């Protein structure tokens, strides 16, 4: 069993039960899924850029991403509906915990001038969004093979009803929030 999942079951669940006075163990918030999204704006002019983004996302997440396409045509961006403009991957279960563990313990500390992640990035429904400026913080990415520094969005979807519950859940799991 994954290290983070074990921690969730043994330490986090009892702590949340006592703090928020839940009646049943099923009320305790848990992480439902993690969605990693990489928008590749230059895929319009350079379709090869998307291939490398998909490859990198596969390495980071450990599963094949879905290519996202434009919903509408936007003339200003020379964009037609249906053109591929990004990639996203949804992690659940074992892989989700593996990724979160890796993110918290290895990748985030490698960010330059890292002082913790923002406390304000909750959406009011108990989900947390985190933007990453460069894919090089992940240990699987080889610095020499990167042709362009790309960022990504990581959305952590929890079953928490409020931001406060979600923040407590992530803090107990070891998410380094700013002081």
From Swiss-Prot:
* GO MF, any single term: rRNA binding
> By what name is this protein known?
Large ribosomal subunit protein uL5
Query: Tell me, which GO biological process terms does this entry list?
Result: translation
Q: Where are the transmembrane segments?
A: none
Task: Tell me the subunit arrangement.
Answer: Part of the 50S ribosomal subunit; part of the 5S rRNA/L5/L18/L25 subcomplex. Contacts the 5S rRNA and the P site tRNA. Forms a bridge to the 30S subunit in the 70S ribosome.
The gene is rplE
Question: What is the similarity comment for this entry?
Answer: Belongs to the universal ribosomal protein uL5 family.
UniProt keywords (A-Z) are:
Ribonucleoprotein, Ribosomal protein, RNA-binding, rRNA-binding, tRNA-binding
Q: Give a short account of what the protein does.
A: This is one of the proteins that bind and probably mediate the attachment of the 5S RNA into the large ribosomal subunit, where it forms part of the central protuberance. In the 70S ribosome it contacts protein S13 of the 30S subunit (bridge B1b), connecting the 2 subunits; this bridge is implicated in subunit movement. Contacts the P site tRNA; the 5S rRNA and some of its associated proteins might help stabilize positioning of ribosome-bound tRNAs.
Q: Which GO terms describe its cellular component?
A: ribonucleoprotein complex; ribosome
Instruction: Return the Pfam families for the record.
Output: Ribosomal_L5, Ribosomal_L5_C
Which InterPro entries does the record cross-reference, listed alphabetically? Ribosomal_uL5 (IPR002132), Ribosomal_uL5_bac-type (IPR020930), Ribosomal_uL5_C (IPR031309), Ribosomal_uL5_CS (IPR020929), Ribosomal_uL5_dom_sf (IPR022803), Ribosomal_uL5_N (IPR031310)
């Amino acid at each position: 069993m994954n290290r983070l999942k074990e921690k969730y079951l043994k330490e986090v669940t009892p702590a949340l039960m006592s703090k928020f006075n839940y009646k049943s163990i099923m009320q305790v918030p848990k992480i439902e899924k993690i969605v990693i999204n990489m928008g590749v704006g230059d895929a319009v002019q350079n379709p090869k850029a998307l291939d490398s983004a998909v490859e990198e996302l596969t390495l980071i997440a450990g599963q094949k991403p879905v290519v996202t396409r434009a919903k509408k045509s936007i003339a200003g961006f020379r964009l037609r509906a249906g053109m591929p403009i990004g990639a996203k991957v949804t992690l659940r279960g074992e892989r989700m915990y593996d990724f979160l563990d890796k993110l918290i313990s290895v990748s985030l500390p490698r960010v330059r001038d890292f002082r913790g992640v923002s406390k304000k990035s909750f959406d009011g429904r108990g989900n947390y969004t985190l933007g990453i400026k460069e894919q090089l913080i992940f240990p699987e990415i080889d610095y020499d093979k990167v042709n362009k520094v790309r960022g990504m969005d990581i959305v952590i979807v929890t079953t928490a009803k409020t931001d406060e519950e979600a923040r407590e859940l992530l803090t107990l799991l070891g998410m380094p929030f700013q002081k």
